[in-house]
Amino acid sequence: MRMQDIERKVIEWLDQHSAKAIRLLKRLIGEKSTLGSEFNAQAVVLEKLRQFHMDIDVWEPSIKQLKQHPYFKSNRSDFHESPNIVAKKTGAGGGRSLILNGHIDVVPEGSVKDWKYEPYQAVEENGKIYGRGSTDMKGGNTALLFALEALHACDVKLKGDVLFQSVVDEECGGAGTLSAIMRGYRADGALIPEPTNMKLFIKQQGSMWFRITVKGLSAHGGTRYEGVSAIEKSMHVITAIQELEKVRNARISDPLYDNIPIPVPVNIGTISGGAWPSSVADRVVIEGRCGIAPHEKPEAVKLELENWLKDLEYHDEWFKRHPVQVEWFGAQWLPNDLPDDHPLISVLQSAYQKMKQTEPIIEASPWGTDGGLLYHAGDTPVIVFGPGETKTAHQANEYIEVEAMIESAKIIALFVMDWCGLHTDGEDADAQVNKE
């Protein structure tokens, strides 16, 4: 059978069985998989994978082993009942291997009052499925599994190996993917179906969390002039951070960031301080996220922020005597930069063009993924492409469009066949003749 005929057969199967993908996504959304609660959602993934006759590896990442790796950054103390899953379909040989990586963990739902429907009810309405994780990224995971199911149902034989990974902890720094790398899983390329709105992200921003402590001097609120308000001093710190963000982003000239207003944000996420309404606050803690451009090293970015805040002492004597304290904690996502001429791009472009009859948009991501770990720790080049829009991720009323999810599954199926290569019955016959 010609490659075009095989591709047509796979696409027709996906069209005819779209209800399977919808049911799977609803089941995945229905299993809440926030930090430490991933077990039941992974059980759904495992049940599906067992239908594909793949070699399956299930394990709980080891904190002891992970702590030995320099890229391990996580707040977790253990991964009890938070298993990783890797399923491998061994190819016939002679093709390129591929990792299909998706994270099963989701961020908390926040206030249920802000939701149109229950966050884990998975309601379908007007071509959209609502629920926490629908876009980030159970819709993408469903697209991967649906593509694999089509290849299995159509008895497609590949030359290269395919490794499907359903990992934990991406939202907290990527310990699940790092554990898979340390377990030996690598490939010639990888695709992560994060919500890119069907764009190809060939460069990914990294990020890391910081904590800044600002000191003050406590006093009675009635005589506040005898104290020094850490809250007021923290306003100077925040202004300095905002100025640094402008300086850092002014350096970005990569055209792939042209449509992103702030390519590498420095976001302030939490502020806490003060102990009593009638007291002058003697301490404020600011926590946030600092973006890392694809070409930057995390250590250099850390040093720049620390030195920038150290300069406050030249403008305020208080900071000279009480310098702000900066620490880096919790999660970190490494940046990633795929060369413009890498075959991952051209092969995915070709698959996209076959389905959409138009050129895909190529951009850089405004957020980090596990792609940085796959590349820097696993020596595996990565491209990010998937259904869903970032604007709904991490928000109330998160949703994904069913049509985009099905369409992305088709593109991914075509991509897998082209990247790994098709092994035909004729090649089996030729191999047998040569053997005899």
From Swiss-Prot:
Q: Which GO terms describe its molecular function?
A: hydrolase activity; metal ion binding
| Residues annotated as binding Zn(2+) 2 | 136, 171, 394
The note on the cofactor says: Binds 2 Zn(2+) or Co(2+) ions per subunit.
Keywords, sorted A to Z = Cobalt, Hydrolase, Metal-binding, Zinc
Domain of life per record: Bacteria
Concerning Gene3D superfamilies, the annotation shows: 3.30.70.360, Zn peptidases
Catalytic residues (positions) = 105, 170 (proton acceptor)
Q: Which SUPFAM superfamilies match?
A: Bacterial exopeptidase dimerisation domain, Zn-dependent exopeptidases
Please tell me where Zn(2+) 1 binds in this chain.
Answer: 103, 136, 194
Required cofactor names: Zn(2+); Co(2+)
| InterPro entries named in the record | ArgE/DapE, Bact_exopeptidase_dim_dom, Peptidase_M20, Peptidase_M20_dimer, Peptidase_M20A, YodQ-like
Q: What are its E.C. numbers? A: 3.-.-.-
Instruction: Give the protein family.
Output: Belongs to the peptidase M20A family.
NCBIfam families to which the protein is assigned, alphabetical: DapE-ArgE, PRK06837.1, PRK06915.1
Q: What is the designated name of this protein?
A: Uncharacterized metallohydrolase YodQ
Species source reads Bacillus subtilis (strain 168)
